Amino acid sequence: MDCPSNVVLLLLQLVLQRQQTLAHRDKSVDLQTLLKDPVIDNDVLVEFKTHKLVQLYGPQYCRDISLRGLKTMVTDIFANGIPKNAQSSGNDQPVTVVDLANYYYMQRINELQNTELPQLKEALLTRLEHMI
């Protein structure tokens, strides 16, 4: 799966929100179970396809992704899991949507701090030098 981390993070946030909604509507549904094995339905698909972030950073997902494709994408995210070096030691619990979202959130912060902000700073300094 070659998807930007910010798009993956958004997808996980939308999935989490949907699981919470389902658990609140139907008290017989256990939220912890949904977090380990989330329900991916048309509501998640529509939210994902129409989100501005997806339109900007992953326009191919706005056009081409079906419900089956979105389910496969989420399954792949769960299958990839969290790298061992990023997990807390001794954690043998099944990975949840929250765990994955936290991991991708930290990954995105690192991308911003180590890549995008320095590039932006360099571009601003270059522009400023040309103005002087």
Curated annotation (Swiss-Prot):
Component of the SWR1 complex which mediates the ATP-dependent exchange of histone H2A for the H2A variant HZT1 leading to transcriptional regulation of selected genes by chromatin remodeling. InterPro entries: SWR1_Swc7. Keywords: Activator, Chromatin regulator, Nucleus, Transcription, Transcription regulation. Present with 4240 molecules/cell in log phase SD medium. The keyword Transferase does not apply. Component of the SWR1 chromatin remodeling complex composed of at least ACT1, ARP4, RVB1, RVB2, ARP6, YAF9, VPS71, VPS72, SWC3, SWC4, SWC5, SWC7 and SWR1, and perhaps BDF1. GO terms for cellular component: chromatin; nucleus; Swr1 complex. It comes from the Eukaryota. This is SWR1-complex protein 7. It is found in: Nucleus. Its main location: nucleus. GO terms for biological process: chromatin remodeling; regulation of DNA-templated transcription. The lineage of its organism: Eukaryota, Fungi, Dikarya, Ascomycota, Saccharomycotina. Belongs to the SWC7 family. Pfam families: SWC7 (PF17330).
